[in-house]
Amino acid sequence: KRQPAERLPALVAGVVRPAAFSAHLMGIPSLTGCVKGWYKKEWWDKLGLERFDQIVADELFEQAVNLGKAGMGRYLQRLCNAFNWRKDGSADGARLFDDLQTDGVVGPKTLSALSIVLSRNDARRIVHLMNCMQGAHYVNSGANRFPLRKFCVGGWPTRTYDPGQEVF
């Protein structure tokens, strides 16, 4: 008996009309607008990115697309937890918010924590650290999965570096 994975190409071929995919996708006049609209609705709006400075919103969006919403969420939650302390001389251990659970769910608690972190730190610094975490993700992925190495340490790190960006 054939396994489901072995039947997949036949199932897909039976459903998809080959002619529908023969033209270059960019030849579809409304495709770019449809894709942009979909990303705005399903990613930008659902993550509530309009509430943040553009540099932060862009980075969150890019990481959600490239790492998945949960992957970006876990790194964001860790970053917020790392900055969850008062700098104003109050007693050691004084937190700004309850530490976040690093479950990858970017909901009201995570977004509120990020707003607090951003109110006390330069947005460029937070974006820089988010990029550091993303870079570490790619290195770890490449170190642990040989077939992915050319992507993980070849091209993907360009997503974490902007040569015109100020480094602190």
Write out the residue ranges for each language-model feature.
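Cell-wall polysaccharide-cleaving catalytic domain and substrate-binding groove, primarily
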Residues: 1-168
